[in-house]
Regions:
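Alpha/beta-hydrolase superfamily serine-hydrolase fold, recognizing
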Residues: 1-190
Length: 190
């Protein structure tokens, strides 16, 4: 597993992810792209770039509390913010601006929900009700379905950002669902 997320500017993170993807793809083994938060947005942008380059697609995207639009356009984010124990709009918007670098924050490489979603791999999303990124993630799921993508959404109303990685009972269920989706995508244990 390799991780690259919001700690690197978009250009560096996406280029690093592309290099790793090409290297691993050359082996011919099935690939599942997974990311949490900014890493989920990066995985989505990578999948779109792979599609646009005509390269072999990943079998599935698994996106945990995905940050798919760094501008947080969904109006429900305002209502959720007081109940979100981890994220605030001001910080998220500033992180998005910094991550974008010289690109506009609306660019699909930065906010992949604004790009072409047709032809992307099947997706499994894990979305939390107490996460300001949740409304955009749910809207993205509907947009992806409308574009012809197969999308499964696991929604946890009382959970917060990154909940699937924590120690709650709901988290363990989410991790089991991630494992099942991964195994189904790659054809079981090799």
């Amino acid at each position: 597993a390799v991780s690259a997320g919001a700690r690197k500017p978009r250009a560096a993170a996406l280029e690093f992810a592309r290099q790793v993807y090409r290297r691993e793809s050359a082996h011919g083994a099935p690939i599942v792209l997974m990311g949490d938060s900014a890493g989920a947005g990066l995985a989505l942008a990578l999948a779109a770039g792979v599609r646009d380059a005509g390269e072999r697609a990943a079998r599935r995207l698994i996106l945990l509390t995905p940050w798919v639009d760094v501008e947080l356009p969904h109006p429900d984010a305002h209502a959720i913010e007081p109940t979100d124990p981890m994220l605030g709009r001001v910080g998220v918007l500033e992180a998005g601006r910094l991550y974008a670098g010289a690109l506009p924050t609306s660019h699909p490489a930065i906010s992949p929900a604004r790009g072409n979603l047709q032809g992307l791999p099947a997706m499994t999303l894990f979305v939390a009700g107490r996460d300001i990124l949740g409304p955009d993630a749910l809207a993205f799921a509907e947009q992806a379905r409308s574009s012809g993508c197969a999308v499964d959404v696991h929604f946890a109303q009382d959970m917060m950002h990154a909940w699937a990685l924590l120690g709650f009972a709901e988290s363990r269920k989410a991790r089991a669902a991630m494992a099942a989706a991964t195994l189904a995508a790659i054809g079981g244990l090799q």
